[in-house]
UniProtKB/Swiss-Prot annotation:
This is D-aminoacyl-tRNA deacylase. Its EC number is 3.1.1.96. A motif (Gly-cisPro motif, important for rejection of L-amino acids) lies at residues 137-138. It is an enzyme of class 3 (hydrolase). It comes from Photorhabdus laumondii subsp. laumondii (strain DSM 15139 / CIP 105565 / TT01) (Photorhabdus luminescens subsp. laumondii). The gene is dtd. A Gly-cisPro motif from one monomer fits into the active site of the other monomer to allow specific chiral rejection of L-amino acids.
Amino acid sequence: MIALIQRVTQANVVVKNEVVGEIGHGLLVLLGVEKGDDQQKAKRLCEKVIGYRIFSDEQDKMNLNVQQIGGSLLVVSQFTLAADTQKGMRPSFSGGAAPDKADELYRYFVEQCRQSGVKTEIGRFAADMKVSLTNDGPVTFWLQV
């Protein structure tokens, strides 16, 4: 399971001209589910995302996590993160989980984030989405479990 996380000052996701998820200061989480992923991996990745210390403390050192700053999450499914780009000029998506399994684990990941107490907004699974953000830094990390 993969999370591409971006520290943002604001982010939103639009489906068919309707804002379906929006946050201020926090993390945009692009989530890719791979074959073989399960609830245990989803829970571990959620814990890592929430606990990852990439927000500045008083000394301007990356030392605080999203929960400590009172930030929010915007979680957007993105199957392209599971692509194999090693060969040729076209990505292969054979490493991605089947859509029903990916949806199940995406929802489980979101549920775990919400249970942690962090405000969590979402995109719409398998929809054509327009994601807008203001990357703060820029600060972007690839997390994988």
